[in-house]
Regions:
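Short loop/beta submotifs within extracellular cysteine-rich repeat domains
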Residues: 59, 113-114, 134-139, 151-152, ...
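Residue-level marker of intrinsically disordered, low-complexity segments enriched
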Residues: 5, 17, 64-66, 73, ...
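Solvent-exposed adhesion/ligand-recognition segments of exported proteins
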Residues: 1-125, 131, 136-141, 146
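Short amphipathic alpha-helical surface micro-motifs
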Residues: 10, 32-36, 41, 111, ...
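Solvent-exposed loop/turn tips at the surfaces of repeat/solenoid architectures
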Residues: 55, 96, 110, 117, ...
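Tandem-repeat/low-complexity and Cys-motif detector
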Residues: 96-97, 120-121, 143-151, 170-177, ...
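Glycine-centered small-residue motifs that form tight turns
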Residues: 102-105, 122-132, 150-161, 176-187, ...
């Protein structure tokens, strides 16, 4: 099942309480072109895959779309196939932990920032995907996937105009299965402390780590970029280009 919720008032949504989808878990897409502020008291109960979408329209199979003008009873029943971002609101994650379940997590917006220990975490093979004008991680914030024994790790895919690590960490961890890949692409990457890692602890290798930017990569020598297998998994590539 999938639940859509959109905000049309022109102000950013402040999420600092509990969103509970009831007895049956469902994927949740929150849409607000003006953006989101996710505070430390936020909790998501019975939520499968979570998407925070700070753009202006969602496209569905068959050509239908959901925007701020679409009538509530005209919501398409087909699968969403694209997110339209002619305008982008900002997404701030302040001391909150998004995800944690076995499903995926996606954030699509303008300036996306994690600070004061904010985190985007998935377990059980769920992927984390971020599409942003700019992404900043500071104050010990984390984007990560963690997978249990025998299960392949979830991937982290980031596409942003600028990516800045100010003491933040991007990491995939697999206890026994193949580690999840980390792919960071976009315009420029700057690190001032922090890390980008894929780690495995079993017989399978860690995932590949790739930072592929069109413009510049800087500060990597002051940070930690690694793909490490602390078992029998062998070597995995780290690519900067």
């Amino acid at each position: 099942e999938r639940v859509f919720a959109r905000v049309t008032g022109g102000e950013s949504s402040v999420l600092d309480g509990t969103i509970d989808l009831g007895a049956t878990p469902a994927d949740l897409i929150l849409m607000n072109p003006s953006g989101f502020v996710v505070g430390p008291n936020s909790q998501f109960s019975q939520v499968g895959e979570l998407t925070l979408f700070a753009g202006n329209a969602i496209e569905f199979a068959g050509g239908a779309r959901l925007d701020l003008e679409t009538a509530a009873d005209a919501l398409p029943e087909t699968e969403p196939v694209g997110f339209i971002t002619d305008t982008r609101g900002d997404v701030q994650v302040i001391g909150a932990t998004l995800g944690q379940g076995g499903s995926g997590l996606s954030i699509i917006g303008g300036d996306v920032s994690f600070r004061s220990g904010g985190a985007a975490l998935t377990g059980g093979g769920g992927d984390v995907r971020i599409d942003a004008t700019a992404l900043t991680l500071s104050g010990g914030s984390v984007i990560g996937t963690v997978s249990p024994e025998g299960q392949a790790g979830g991937e982290i895919r980031i596409d942003a105009g600028t990516v800045s690590l100010e003491g933040g960490n991007i990491r995939t961890v697999a206890a026994g299965g193949h580690g999840g890949e980390v792919l960071i692409s976009g315009g420029s990457f700057h690190a001032n402390g922090g890390s980008v890692q894929s780690v495995s602890f079993g017989s399978e290798p860690a995932g590949a780590v790739t930072i592929a930017m069109d413009d510049t990569i800087s500060g990597v020598m002051d940070s930690f970029v690694d793909a490490a297998s602390y078992g029998d998994g062998g070597l995995s590539p780290v690519t900067l280009k």
